[in-house]
């Protein structure tokens, strides 16, 4: 309980004191921890004569849209892997980015359509869980060769 004190002045010169009690509460939520175990890796890609989209799905599969000769080359593309730990039964909500840019020797490459292989809102199971994040990479025609890198943020929030 907290004590509240209020001074009131009447029309005269008398000061009256009024004391009341009210309850103050606070809900402390258990901590949630998010750890990145491995990065989102598009692997090695050969750009084509036309723009294309290379997708690493959250389940680890890959796909290509748009054609133009875009293809993976001797690599093992993989989704990012994350670990969530905390008190079992805690409600959570994952937040993924809309889009990011990869920077390298040529023009920037856009990564978009991020997806996770778990429900974005959910309840933490006993022992926590791992989940994977995939996304699509837009590759322009004749993109300059080289290493392209960027950073994306995944947040775990309380709903």
Language-model features: where?
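N-terminal small/polar-rich segments of proteins
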Residues: 1-94, 123-159
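Short N-terminal segments immediately surrounding and downstream of signal-peptide cleavage
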Residues: 23-25, 102, 113
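Short acidic, flexible loop segments centered on an aromatic residue
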Residues: 94-102
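Short beta-strand and strand-turn-strand segments in soluble, beta-rich domains
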Residues: 105-117
């Amino acid at each position: 309980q907290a004590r509240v004190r209020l001074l009131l002045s009447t029309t005269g010169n008398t000061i009256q004191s009024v004391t009341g009690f009210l309850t103050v509460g606070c809900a402390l939520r258990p901590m949630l921890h998010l750890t990145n175990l491995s990065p989102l890796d598009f692997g090695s890609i050969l750009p084509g004569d036309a723009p294309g989209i290379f997708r690493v799905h959250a389940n680890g599969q890959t796909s290509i849209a748009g054609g133009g000769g875009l293809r993976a080359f001797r690599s093992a593309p993989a989704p990012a892997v994350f670990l969530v730990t905390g008190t079992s039964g805690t409600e959570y909500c994952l937040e993924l980015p809309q889009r990011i840019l990869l920077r390298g020797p040529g023009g920037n490459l856009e990564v978009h359509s991020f997806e996770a292989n778990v429900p974005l809102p959910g309840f933490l199971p006993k022992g926590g869980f791992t989940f994977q994040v995939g996304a699509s990479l837009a590759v322009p025609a004749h993109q300059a060769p080289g290493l392209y890198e960027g950073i994306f943020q995944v947040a775990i929030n309380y709903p």
